[in-house]
Every structure is written in structure tokens, then in C-alpha cells.
Amino acid sequence: MQTDRHLQSAGRAPGRSINYRRRAEIFRWLHRAVILAGSLAVMLVVLSPVAWLVSSSFQNEAEIVSVPPHWIPDQPTLKNFKAIFAATGDETVTYETRNKQDPASGDYIPSTAGNLLPAMANSFIVATLVVILNLLVGIPAAYAMAKIRFYGRNGSIYFILTTRVIPDIALVVPFFLVIKNLGLLDHILSLVITYLAITVPFTVFILIQYFEGLPDELDKAARVDGCSRFQSLTRVFLPLAMPSLVAVILFAFLTSWNEFLLALMFTQTAASQTLPIVLASFTSDFTISFSFINAAGLLAIVPPVIVAIVFERYIVSGLTAGAVKG
Amino acid sequence: MRLRRHFNYEERTALLFIAPVMTVLGVVAVFPIAYSFYLSFFRIKLTRPNRTPFVWFDNYLHLFKDEMFWTAVLRTTTFTVISVAAITLLALFVALLLNQDFRGRRLVSTVLLIPWAIPYVADALMWKWIYDSGYGALNGLLYQLDFIDKYMIWLGDQDKTLALIANAFVWKEVPLATILLLVSLKSIPSDLYQAARVDGAPLLQRFFHVTLPSMRTGFMLVIIYETMIAIRHFDLFFILTEGGPGTASHVLSWEIYVETFRNLSFGSGAAMSYLLALITFALAYFIIRTLGRSV
């Protein structure tokens, strides 16, 4: 900066250096204004749809169908959340009570409202199992590919790379037939197994990147001290790899939590349906209140949003590492 | 015993360590792909489970003669081109912004992660409600700002539907693209800028002659990666339009879904998904090639 300004002003007549300084000041001011405007625009575009979802979920029926919309609810209500959390009682609407109302008015909380919490539990169980399996198979493999020279090492890395890009929709047809034959349809195990296909390659990849970044000398020192490869991995590398493990856990969890296509194919009843499936079933029913749908949507985005905000640093570094090679 | 003779300790450990991953991926990735290739040579209708004749390339030939398939290809291409172009451009702006040093930068980058984190289904229901023709926020906002004098139909309008779905897609994909572009922005050596400044290159010239060319790999990565995601995207189409109105959003992934799970023709569904997988592999090959060259 210093030399550069010096060079530039040296080339000009003395009288014009003041002019230059003012120009720099205007430029700096403009720079700040552009940054401010840009930041505000980004925040507005990202947050306003979400804010509208939140606002809608607290509106009562009269407000949600008002034209033009009430951006902020006049009389915020918790009735949707009550219906979800206390699925039994007055708030549950059965076929009979529904018939008493005019379905066209849309003032309708579906009888399946009570499925949301079990679906959340299903999503949570599936995601947790997927995370555990990812760590179990991913950590040793990534360590071996990053730190041990063996015949076929490059080949196995390329293999992981290739499996990473298999589109989920290409897996649906064969998976469906296999799972049907195994009798696993409508069982959360079918989701745990198939989600491995879309999470494990990414997991291994991020971990390889991270292990490769750790010095080989650590390994040598551990081996000289009499550690086996396994001990070297668990006692030396794993504690150091914590940040990447956090990233891996988050990605596997969020991917499973958010997954829709495979769950749509393999689940049929509330016994195995995950949150996205129950949510999607609400959106296709025109008689369900919009504010209820938004409330359900709000519940679905709260956990991932909290995770994203709390673990921002790990997520960004993980995505960056995952990006470098594919 | 034989294992011990052929491989030394290192190699045995390595094999032991990678065996679980190879088994898992063999079962959940390699096998299904091979199996769907195999299936694509049979006529499999779940309505007639006992008759599954081997039909050679009939499923593929049938596809190429099917008008719906070509419509789906066209819709997928349109959706992908609109989305990827918008994602790349917007991500470039946001990445340039986040590459500056200013107070509140952390806040902006944290907020930016929100769309990335939420499920596509939630993204879909959020935009479906915004686009709603009766009570939606888009109508409300445009009406209050006097851009329209009566509420309009959005998703139900053939000419708008793909662009509106693309909007919901772009909203969710820009954060990741931004992070990827930011990596390549940060890796531009500052000497380049110094040199350009000493040479008296003005801001815009520095941008076009230093910044953009240095980000080539980043752009490549974003474009190919987002293309791979966009051509197979399913969730938004399922919830927002179900391929409609008419065939306005009838993309390939939707066509695969309809063919497989509504018409119950698993053979031709498998053929189509296999084609989609091949396209994705071709794109991925380019990723590996280009990155392999630059690293």
C-alpha cells in the first residue's frame, strides 16, 4: 500500500496530489457504501423468505388468507404448534370434525399433524445411525488412503471420487427392487443403508484431505514408540482430526435429515416416514391451512439452521476441503 | 497365511482399513449402478411381475422415439442453464463482497449458510406459499408496490414456472457456490494486484484481467458441480408443480419418477436413470480432468 501510493503520487505534479487524496477518500467512501448495500441485499434476499415463513406460521386463519397479506401477524397464535405438540385433544381434527367445517375455507389442521414429531424422531434416528456408520467405515479408510503407501491407493481414491458423483435418482430404481425383495420397505433401515451411498464418499473425501494435511512425522514417531497403525490412528491422529470429524458429522447428519427422494420411495407409513416426507404430504393437500404448513416447515428448518449458525466455521472449512478435489 | 506371504504389514493394515468402505460402497453404490444397467435390458412392469422379457436395447430405443423424453431433456436443459448461470453470477457477487474486510462480514457469511442448511422440502413449501396465486407474498408485495393491479397466477403459468422453480433452487444453491468461489478468490496471490496497481490498471481492468482469469478453476468447479446437481434435481419439481402445468416443468428426474413409480415400468425407468448417471459421470470426468491439471 505505502510504496504503491508513493509511486503513484510521485508520478504526478505536486499540485495534483491533493486531488488524488480526495479521490482516494471518495473511493473509500464508495467502497464502504457498496459493501453496506451488498450486505443488506444479501441479508434481505436470504432472510425475508424465511421471515415470511415464520410470520405465517403464527397467523390465524383470517389473517393468513388476507389480501394483501399481513406481513406481521396482528394476533399471533400458537394453535398450529399446539396441534403439533399436543396431537391429542381438541386441536386434532378428524374426518368428522373436518366435515363440520367448510373445507374450502382451508381452516384445517390435518389429523396427521401428530405424525410430525414421530417423523422428526425417525429423521433423528436415521441421521444418527448414518453418522455413526460413516465414522466407523470412513475414518480407517481415510487414514489408510492418506498415510499408508499401498498398492491400489490411487485407485481406491479415484473409486471414492467416482462414487461421490453417482446421482441419487440413478440409485432409486435398483434400490427399490432390492429393498422390496429384502422386505425392508417402510423400514428405517432401508434409509440408513441407502443414505450411506450419498454420505460415505463425501465423508472419506473430507477426512483424506485433513489427514493428508497432518505431518507424516507424527506417524513415524508413533510407530517408533511402538504403536501399531491402529493405535497411531486412534491415539495420535483422531484427536488432531477433531475439526474435520465435526464437519463430517454435520454433513452426514444434515444430508440425512434433509434427504427426500429416497425416503419418498422407501417409506409408506408413519412408522418409517421422515420429516421431509410428512412435510411434503401436507403441501399436496389443498384443504390444509397455509399457516399450519408453514408451522411444520418452521419446525423442519430450526434444527439445521441452529446447526449451521453454531458450527459455521467447521462447515465452511469442511466444504472448502471437500471442494478442492471434487 | 497366504495373505501374510503376499502383503507386508503396511499393506495388510491398509487393506483391513479400507475393506469396510469398499464393502459398503460396493453394496450401496457399485451394485445398484450395475444392477440398473442390467435392468435396463428387460421389460419390467410391476403390474405383470411374472413376465420380464429380455429386450436388448428396446428400452433405450423406445426412449429416443418418445416425445415426452425429449420434452423432459429440453426442460432439464432449460432449468439447468438458467439455474447454473444465475447461481454462478450471484455467487460471484457475494464472494467478491465476502472477500472484502468489513465489520459484519461474519454475520453475513453465517446468515448465508441458512439456505444451504435447510431441507429442500422446506425450501419448496416456503416458495410454494410465496408464489401462491390466492394469498401469496409475491402477489401481495407486487400489489402493494403497485406493480400489478390484481393477483396473478405464478407457478400455474407455463411461461414462468421453470424460472420460478429455478429461483427457489438458486436461493438454496448460491451459498455453496459462494464458498467455492471464495476459496479461489482467496488463493489469488496479492502480488498480482500489486503489480497491476503499480502498472496503473484501474479497478475494472484489475477485475477483468486479474481477478476473473485467476478464478477459472473456481468457476469451472462451480459450474460443473451445480450442473450435476441441477440436472438431477427432483424435490422442488415434486412439491411445487409435479411436472406441470402441462409439461412446462416435466424434467428428466420427474419423468423417471412417473415412468417408474406411476407407470410401474422399471425397465425403462432404469434405462433413463442410467442415461442420467452417464451424463453425470461425463461431467465429473471433466471436473477431475480440469482440477487434475490445475493442482
Language-model segments: what does each one mean?
Chain A
Residues 1-26:
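Short, Lys/Arg-rich, polar N-terminal cytosolic tail immediately upstream
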Residues 11, 23, 32-326:
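A structural signal for multi-pass alpha-helical bundles of membrane permease subunits
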